[in-house]
Amino acid sequence: PAPKMLDALIIGAGFAGLYQLHLLRDRQKLDVLVLEAADGVGGTWYWNRYPGARCDSESWSYCLQFDDALVRDWRWTERYPRQPEILRYLNHVADRFDLRSHIRLNTRVSEAQFEEASDSWLVTTATGEQYRARFLIAAVGCLSAANIPNIPGLGDFKGRWYHTGEWPHEGVDFTGKRVGQVGTGSTGIQSAPVIAADAA
């Protein structure tokens, strides 16, 4: 069977994907679908669960501004909220505006081709499902893939190593462990004191 023609297809259900879904579906009245690789909404804030993860911008800047009641009703508990609170906020947005009904979770896009003959995008998922859309919005963000550095000898390392962009959702027990850290960006600064509190 030929794939159904959508008005728009959005890749990613983080801040940008949720907002675009609301804008295109609810305001523009378009037939829209979001494809999300994770099993939940949140984008960066779904994937990045490393110890100490939090925003480094004030909480008010994380409020979607398209609805006065949404802005009024949500109360951040901290000036710089932690990852779990930001993820709760995004789930709140998805529920409040019934966005989940137009989101397919656990669906990774493997290919997108623009076909001039039909003036549309043909999008294929990792399982071979296909979707066709007049408009394609890649809302995958700049942090959707871990930037794993090419460190000589990493493949020979006998211990465990973790990247903050691929942190296990069940967490890591560092109690009594010797831990080394590479990197002192905002993620490193957030995670180091939390890990150090448990490590040897």
Task: Cite the ranges covered by each PLM segment.
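Active-site acidic short loop of glycosyltransferases
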Residues: 6, 132-133, 159, 176
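Glycine-rich active-site loop/strand segments that organize a redox cofactor
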Residues: 46-89, 200
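Feature captures the FAD/FMN-dependent oxidoreductase FAD-binding
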Residues: 76-143
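Extreme N-terminal leader/targeting segments of oxidoreductases
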Residues: 1-8, 26-31, 55, 88, ...
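N-terminal Rossmann-like FAD-binding beta1-loop-alpha1 element of flavoenzymes
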Residues: 3-34, 188-196
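Glycine-rich dinucleotide-binding loop and its adjacent helix/turn
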Residues: 69-76, 82-86, 140-198
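A short beta-to-alpha transition loop/helix N-cap that caps and shapes the active-site region
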Residues: 41-46, 145
